[in-house]
Amino acid sequence: MFQVRKVEDASFDGVIMRLEGNCDLAGGGVLEQKLTFLSAGRPQRVVFDLEALEFIGSFGIGQLVAFNKGLRINGGKVALARVSEGIHHALKFSRLTDMFSVHATVEDAKAALMVG
């Protein structure tokens, strides 16, 4: 089962989204819906906490890429935090590690988005 949860953090001027489980084709549809809803609010800073993400397929990766591009067009920034070795390998294999700011912790990701 795949879930996307918004994490409340009053100390951060942005949004933290936690992805959990297996983001296969069905999960990619859930992710697409959540990201569409999130985009409507025009956030400027978004951290995706991937610690509990076990798998993400190409459709899910495509949703993150599209969200990132849309946010950047509007001056926003995206960072990934706590990315597992397997997910990081998939991003690197897809040559997406240059597109996303990847950080060891949520705190590091938040700090990186606050710069600039």
Can you annotate each of these PLM segments?
Residues 11, 51, 107:
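Conserved catalytic submotifs in the C-terminal HATPase_c
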